């Protein structure tokens, strides 16, 4: 089950004002029996800073009072402020993160293909008891992103916070902002890496455009965007990696242009290309600085994914190729990302009188191969070669062999291939879409040829010769 936290009043942050700070402090006190017993009727008054200092003196007198206040304050900030800011104030979170996975550490993405029509025949045999199995595709997405952030607040920091209402605000923001902003930035970088990785892997349909050096090319780009947006509304298999039939309504599309491309083309012109009002277009647009990583982002990415087994660094050639990408155009459900755990914890070290605060951010960060996805680039997709491994092998009757195809491509061309086997005499000799060869136990042929044919360019193929020894 996936849930998304919501705020009743729609507020998105804590105001830095005496009235707001006094209300926050009093709310923490009212929710704690320990603090109510310690403070009695003493409460913060936004018009009287001395009331805050009185509270601070009581809280600082015993560790249990101080801890009770900090835990209460942190729970409020963590459950209300941060969750709400995280969901509502960040465009990437709001438009790509689906919610929170409450049970288990994986989720299955299931796609049921459209039913195939059959000709009606009033005089034909009854098919009432015939079994028509649905064509079902599925993919599992697992917990693959576990990060934590830490900040330390000293006893001195806590004392100074109660000298003024702005001091309380500064204490909260010092803890919250640094960790929250770090988590938010890292999520953006993880999504950006996912886009960059999958663009280079050739899983998106390529729309080749000219460089935006003049008005004519800009107009042609807008025409291309409009054409793709319109085509997405019609069921087809051309824009999905899995080859399933899908469609995407305009309001369910996400258009991710580079900042410089958006500035050059113009937001109003892009809105017209989508045939949407300006406000509606803002709902489908997602901003990105560039598809290549800046030096600062490169450093952060290296830290973020250090020792991560699922991280495949971009090669220099792949980084250079990303400079040619103007925009990505996807179904809003192409990103398959959700929270698994987004929680705060605190711990006080009695030996140093310092309080450590921790933010744990665990996520599933993935994508759906069943959703439409298009990349706009100045490059043209080209297949250079297809090589099958192993090139030769001996496989006995009734045995199996896993083959692989290495596709050398440029321009983000699809690296998918179709497999077939030639020379077989047995119907039991087959090869799966993933290249698993099964030799039938009744096979009489002594030699088979396995071919891998590029789906992007059928003139490019590779082959392997398989010897079937006689028993």
Kindly give the residue locations of the regions a language model identified.
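Low-complexity "stalk/linker" and mucin-like segments enriched in Ser/Thr/Pro/Ala/Gly
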Residues: 422-437
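Extended oligomerization regions of viral-like shell subunits
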Residues: 46, 220-336
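Extended, compositionally biased alpha-helical segments that mediate assembly or anchoring
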Residues: 1-74, 287-381
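Short, well-ordered beta-strand segments
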Residues: 411-426
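A short beta-strand micro-motif common to beta-rich folds, especially ectodomain repeats
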Residues: 444-457
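Solvent-exposed, low-complexity, repeat-rich "mucin-like" stalks and linkers
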Residues: 385-414
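Long, contiguous amphipathic alpha-helices that act as assembly "spine/axial" helices in icosahedral shell
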Residues: 135-207, 356-359
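Assembly/oligomerization interface modules of large self-assembling protein complexes
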Residues: 64-151
